[in-house]
Each structure stands twice: as structure tokens, then as C-alpha cells.
Amino acid sequence: MAFAVLMPATQSHAETIYVDEANPPFMYRAGDEAVGIYPALIRAIFRHASINVDVVAVPWKRAIENLDANKGGVAGIYKNLERQKKYVFSEPIHVEQLMLYQRLSTFNNPTDIDDLRGQTVGVIRGWSYGDQIDDARKRGVFSASEATGDEQNFQMLALGRVDTVIAIGEAGDVWVKRLGLSDKVVRSETPIRKNPTYIVFHRASSTISTVTMINRSIEELRENGTLQRISQEVLQGASNY
């Protein structure tokens, strides 16, 4: 996929950016390559900023561990109060809509986190869903069932082992279709939350000196429509994932 606005990178070394290996269509592994919306956005943003980048897909928990160990940055991550103390955030690169999925037989069209009171909710291990949802989990509004990814969560939902799954709309829809659950699982009509996503680096990283360049690239590619075009093209191509 080529974009005329991109300029050749000139740095001799590559910055490492980790992404989740199991969150299609946003970020996932295909063979040895990181693919999906975020890897495509990251490569475009860094190339436009003339910064070489190596995008690596790993389990999300390991991505965060590598970030905490200052082994590289992470993309496709939400901002919360705890993370702001440790990481430097770029400008937003995308906005995700968190949807609630339930079995058709028990669907009550939840619209608020309090609608999950007393339920067992499927979440992804190591994820933050934003301060509001994270706080509700800590307060025991719902009981969290952790899985390695959306696929496992939707399998658990189909089997009746969880009551609800929290998932990004585009990603959840991919798994409902791929697992053949379209006649068994439905999603809420409105998102429970909208979360911007970012590129982040550890505050001890020497790479944070390039964040200004990265932010300028993000702003320019957003203004000329490149980021939106990339997202749409990758999403369209992932419809058959």
C-alpha cells in the first residue's frame, strides 16, 4: 500500500514499537509480520517523520512489560491516570468505540457500566479500558473474566461462561462473523465509551526527544486525510480476515 505523502526515512537505526498480536483488525500477527490498522498507521507516521521503525506484534501483556522495561514504545494504547505518570503520550492516532456484546437470548441493550452490575464480563488480560471502566471493575460492579484475546472471550460468551464481552466495535464484529455467531451474539446500539489511542514511550526513554516530530507527523497526516484513508483501507481489507 503506497501513499504519495510519505517521505523516505533517513535514520540509521529503527525505533521499536510493540503492538498486540491478537486484536484484529487493529493489530495482529500474520506470520512474522505485525499487520492491521495500527501497524499501518505507525509505519506511515514514522516514515513521514523520517524515523525508521520496527513494528513488532507480541502478546499485549508482554508489550506492556517491554514498555515498562524501556525496551521500546507501544501503540494502540489508552490513556489513564496511572499510565500518565510513567509514559509520554503522542497525539491521538485513532479513536476506538468500546461496545458491549451479549447473547441474543439474554440481551438487554446495556448503555451504561452500571447495567453490568453483578455480571461476569469478558475482558482481555493486561488491558486498561479507561479509568471509568477500570474503576467499576475495582469496585466490584462486575466480575472480570480475563482472556488472552477477543477470540477466547467470544467463545466463552457463546458457551455461556461470561454474560457480556467488552470489545472494540470493529474487532468484536470481526470475531462474531469469523466464529459464526451472528445469529447468537448481538452488541449494544451505542458505545459504552470512546477511547483515543496513542503511541507511548517510557519517560526514561531517549526516544521521547522525537515525540515532537512524531506529533507533527500525526497532525499533518490527519489534516490531509491520510490517517483516515489508511484506517478505512485496512479495515476494508480485513473484512475477510
Regions found by a protein language model. Name each.
Residues I42-I51, E91-P92, D115-R117, S128-T148, ...:
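Ligand-binding cleft/hinge of the Venus flytrap
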Residues A14-K85, E146, N224, E233-V234:
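Extracytoplasmic small-molecule ligand-binding "clamshell" domains
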Residues M7-A14:
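Sec/Tat signal peptide C-region and signal peptidase I cleavage site
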Residues K61-G72, V88, D114-D115, E151-E170, ...:
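Short helices/loops that flank or line small-molecule/ion binding pockets
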Residues R43, D54-D115, W127-Y129, E189-I192:
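Acidic, polar ligand-binding/catalytic clefts
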